[in-house]
UniProtKB/Swiss-Prot annotation:
<dbReference type="InterPro" id="IPR014167">
    <property type="entry name" value="Tol-Pal_TolB"/>
</dbReference>
<dbReference type="GO" id="GO:0042597">
    <property type="term" value="C:periplasmic space"/>
</dbReference>
<dbReference type="InterPro" id="IPR011042">
    <property type="entry name" value="6-blade_b-propeller_TolB-like"/>
</dbReference>
<protein>
    <recommendedName>
        <fullName>Tol-Pal system protein TolB</fullName>
    </recommendedName>
</protein>
<keyword id="KW-0732">Signal</keyword>
<comment type="function">
    <text>Part of the Tol-Pal system, which plays a role in outer membrane invagination during cell division and is important for maintaining outer membrane integrity.</text>
</comment>
<dbReference type="GO" id="GO:0017038">
    <property type="term" value="P:protein import"/>
</dbReference>
<feature type="signal peptide">
    <location>
        <begin position="1"/>
        <end position="25"/>
    </location>
</feature>
<dbReference type="InterPro" id="IPR007195">
    <property type="entry name" value="TolB_N"/>
</dbReference>
<dbReference type="Pfam" id="PF04052">
    <property type="entry name" value="TolB_N"/>
</dbReference>
<dbReference type="InterPro" id="IPR011659">
    <property type="entry name" value="PD40"/>
</dbReference>
<dbReference type="Pfam" id="PF07676">
    <property type="entry name" value="PD40"/>
</dbReference>
<comment type="similarity">
    <text>Belongs to the TolB family.</text>
</comment>
<keyword id="KW-0131">Cell cycle</keyword>
<comment type="subunit">
    <text>The Tol-Pal system is composed of five core proteins: the inner membrane proteins TolA, TolQ and TolR, the periplasmic protein TolB and the outer membrane protein Pal. They form a network linking the inner and outer membranes and the peptidoglycan layer.</text>
</comment>
<dbReference type="GO" id="GO:0051301">
    <property type="term" value="P:cell division"/>
</dbReference>
<keyword id="KW-0574">Periplasm</keyword>
Length: 441
């Protein structure tokens, strides 16, 4: 097999020479369509020399398997052939025993502590059918950051096989609540539910946390004072400040793609209108000006357009306008009401919540209003938020009240095809979630 003639020399060059599209074509992976047959990935134990290396390697693989299997397009497993499996000190296969368990893709690697409290993982991805190395990459990290490193490894595998960016090394901000008055807190966790922390204390009514494009800051609504205010929170320093510039009751804050502006809605004198706040100067610019309710504004990724919902036609519908507020036009045309729009980071879709009769849906449509598709339905579903690669949607799902669960609100994801739904592991009831960009390694 040609696989054994590769050495760990210039893996990036090897990856470029082989090309991504050949592997994708061979495996038949198209994440924009519902895949009926999953790509089978076998992950081999990492070559290690010490107990510390061995345990971190095992922990990383467990996280990688969970990440990959959550996509609905992979069947990833940690298997060993009957005769055992061995790799070189660099993590390269040194026998053909792997062919008995690996069908589509084989992942091998090595882990080595190279300094006090720091390790290096070398990860290799192999195409089983051709016996070729698809990629090789190194990950250097502090031992305490092994989980984030594992998510980055998952991103590397996902990206190499699908040709799309990964979304595993990310965080989710949400509102943690019990359903009782005054029991809402802003919380942040990894996308798989790990490392949950609270940003705000108890007794403060808060809502709609939204990450900045660099994931260093949050904006959210706080109603600790009368009228409510938009709070800008620095996640690195813990410092919070209220945004000024707009009077009245504020709501629905969201960053611009470059992080220089925040969109929000202001309610005053019987109407609600959308403003843009320049974070450097504090200057506010009014973008809508009528007697209706205009809210939930979201920029397009190129910052040239804004989608929002408005009841100016009698019930909530989706509208798009230029970034300066001109050329406002309605894009939704189906039955029912539309709300909570969120523009995909790819620019190709707008996610929304739709109510029709007693039914709630999460769906997508193109920016011109065409191609509407409903992806998820529930007793009450709301607040869609995109993964950074624009292929998965996170939303809130509230279950009907029962004797055992008078209030139950969960975070759920659905892929762009509507075929793969996952319930996230969250320690409390949760709502109003927002997905961060991919974190820096």
């Amino acid at each position: 097999m040609r696989i054994f003639f590769f050495a760990y020399v210039l893996p990036t060059v090897i990856s470029l020479l082989l090309g991504c599209q050949g592997a994708i074509a061979a495996l038949g992976v198209d994440i924009t369509k519902g895949n009926t047959e999953k790509v089978k990935i076998s992950v081999a134990p990492m070559h290690s020399s010490t107990n510390l290396e061995k345990e971190i390697g095992k922990s990383c693989i467990r996280v990688m398997l969970r990440d990959l299997n959550s996509t609905g397009i992979f069947d990833a497993s940690w298997k060993l052939p009957a005769g055992g499996f061995s790799t070189t000190s660099e993590g390269m296969p040194d026998s053909n025993a792997w062919t008995s368990v690996a069908k589509d893709v084989l992942v091998t690697g090595s882990i080595k502590e190279f300094a006090q409290g720091r390790v290096k993982v070398k990860l290799f991805i192999w195409d089983v059918a051709s016996g070729r190395q698809l990629s090789g990459k190194s990950f250097n990290f502090a031992t305490g950051n092994w989980r984030r490193a594992a998510h980055s490894m998952s991103d590397s595998i996902y990206s190499r096989i699908t040709g799309e960016g990964g979304y595993f090394n990310t965080r989710i901000a949400y509102v943690a609540e019990t359903g009782l008055p005054g029991s809402r807190r802003i919380a942040i966790m990894d996308q798989d539910g790990a490392n949950n922390i609270y940003i705000t204390g108890r007794g403060e009514f808060v809502s709609t946390p939204r990450f900045s494009p660099d994931a260093r800051n949050l904006v959210y609504m706080s109603y600790a004072k009368s009228g409510g205010s938009v709070v800008l929170h620095d996640l690195e320093t813990g410092y919070s400040t209220a945004l000024g510039g707009v009077r009245g009751v504020n709501s629905s804050p969201r960053f611009s793609p470059d992080g220089r502006h925040v969109l929000l809605s202001e309610s005053a004198q019987g109407s609600t209108n959308i403003y843009s706040i320049d974070l450097k100067s504090g200057k506010s610019t009014r973008l809508t000006n009528d007697r209706s309710i205009n809210t939930s504004a979201s920029y397009s990724p190129d910052k040239k357009s804004i989608v929002f919902n408005s009841d100016r036609s009698g019930r909530p519908q989706l509208y798009v306008m230029n970034a300066d507020g001109t050329n406002q036009r309605r894009i939704s045309s189906g039955k029912g009401g539309y709300s909570a729009p969120a523009w995909s980071p790819r620019g190709d879709w707008i996610a929304f919540t739709k109510t029709e009769g007693k039914s709630f849906h999460v769906g997508v449509m193109k920016p011109d209003g065409s191609g509407e598709r409903l992806l998820a339905k529930g007793y009450m579903v709301d607040s869609p938020s995109w993964s950074p690669n624009g292929r998965v949607i996170l939303f809130t799902q509230q279950d009907p009240p029962s004797a055992t669960h008078p209030f139950r609100s969960r975070l759920v994801t659905v892929d762009i095809t509507g075929t793969n739904t996952q319930i996230l592991d969250v320690p409390t009831n949760a709502s109003n979630a927002h997905w961060s960009p991919v974190l820096r390694e």
